[in-house]
Amino acid sequence: AFGKLQGTLTSQLSVDFELGGKTEKMPMPALINLRSHPDEATRRRGYEAENIAWEAVKETLVACMNGVKGETLTLDKKRGREDAIHASIDFARMDRKTLNAMLDAMKDSFPMFQKYFKHKAKLIGKEKLAWWDISAPMGKTDKVYSFEEARDFIVSNFNKFSPELGAFAKRAFDNNWIDAEQRDGKRGGAFCMGVAGVKESRILSNFDGSFDQVSTLAHELGHA
């Protein structure tokens, strides 16, 4: 219930935002996608508007999180589990050893990520990155992908790695497993979920034509 409340609340959030000389109600998914806008001033305004929007509903979102975590802790206690990570491990169909190996690999990679962000800051003329610069695009491009172009790009590159994976991605597109449209009332972000009854997956994304969203779509198909 608390998870559904969080999803319903965040999907209805919108802010008045000026873009291209025109002020409109912008849903949160579209606002979040401005993190990769080529103009720094637009990225910063989007970041600040996003924070203001979250601030307005922070008490409800905190209550949702406490409700979800409280339920998990109660169930773990009843089941005699040591900590709250077990529910997430079970949901992901993995064991603790695999999780620890993944976390260790991530920690080992921290210096590489730090080096990348320092170099990115240098390339855009800064000593260090502001939060609104983390997803800033590198270089300049006017390319905007249609959904069909994104599909062809993903399937083609999946095929280079594995024809089986490419065929699977094509099946997902052909059978409309993907809800990619940005619209009012839709939750932000992207995710993939399995549908056990039909042994298929369904994917949510908020596709805006950017390469970042093409990459996100490919990422979620990897989960499928």
Predicted regions and their residues:
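A metal-dependent hydrolase signature that marks the N-terminal structural subdomain at the beginning
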Residues: I85, F91-E164
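A glycine-rich phosphate-binding loop feature that marks nucleotide/adenosyl-phosphate handling sites
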Residues: E18-T23, T74, K120-M138, R171-Q182
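Short pre-active-site segment immediately N-terminal to the catalytic Zn-binding motif
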Residues: D142-F147, F153, K160, A196-A218
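Structured ligand/cofactor/substrate-binding pocket environments in proteins
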Residues: G46, A53-W54, K58-V62, S205-N206, ...
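His/Asp/Glu-rich acidic catalytic environments and adjacent acidic regulatory segments
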Residues: A1-K97, A101, A105-D108, S156-N157, ...
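Catalytic Zn2+-binding segment of zinc metalloproteases
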Residues: G222-A224
